Amino acid sequence: MMKIREFKNSIEFKNDGQLSLFFLGTGGAFSKKYFQNNALIIKGNSHILIDCGTLCPLAFSFFNSDITQVRNFLLTHNHADHIGGMEEIALVNMYGTKQVPNILITDEFKKILWNESLKGGLKIKGENSAKPTMSFDDYFHQIKPKKIKKSPRPFYEAKIGDINLKIFRTKHIFTDKNNWKNSYYSIGVLIDNKIIYTGDSQADKELIEWLTSEFNIECIFHDCQFGHNAVHTDYEELLKILTPDLRKKTYLCHYSDNADQQKDRVMQDGFAGCVTRGVYYDCE
């Protein structure tokens, strides 16, 4: 079960050892009310930020904290609401903290992230330098996850301090509905073998059934849109793929600005609720 704990003063990057999630934002790409769906995982002395969108540095400031405190990142895909803050992360660390942040990332996505998103703003250092042309490795330290064999989809594992993370491919944007292999690169995260964080995903019964059959899942944070959406999980579809028992464990996130109008229905339909930004979700 998840216990909700209030935010006080500034974001905590350490705790007494329980697994906690703090959502900087809970909104979709175009939300003007909820910031973007980016979440900090904390456990003991360890932390990692899942996604860092264009508004993420501002969100940290909103919660009286500095994003340069984040030393570990995991990015689910290269849409701006998930990676748009990473150019700032690269530059404020290079010229400010003089530290190199860690990114948990596969070789496949490392190439996509650099060549298709970050390279345009970071390739040229812009000063007299013995190395005027920069690369991903000049700004970030790659933590490469280990591939897990015998899984129905690419499945990787790594540890960030005390936090165990497994990443899996999701169906977000694709050209063939029946084949995730043709889909745009996007991942979800299994945290400490008990929390599913879907990232951006369409309704994916096969994925949920696989994870819940293999692991003792205590909580699911699921992408959800209220109204038809071609690249996210529609609420009506989610009702169809989640059993009543799973709904009790599921919090909805990455929603649009009309979510307030749906919260009563969400509870009536048996979900744990809509995620609230700015509180701690502690795994008991």
Kindly label every feature range from the protein language model.
Residues S201-E284:
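Cap/insert and terminal regions of metallo-dependent hydrolase folds
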Residues M1-I196, Q261-E284:
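Binuclear metal-dependent hydrolase catalytic cores
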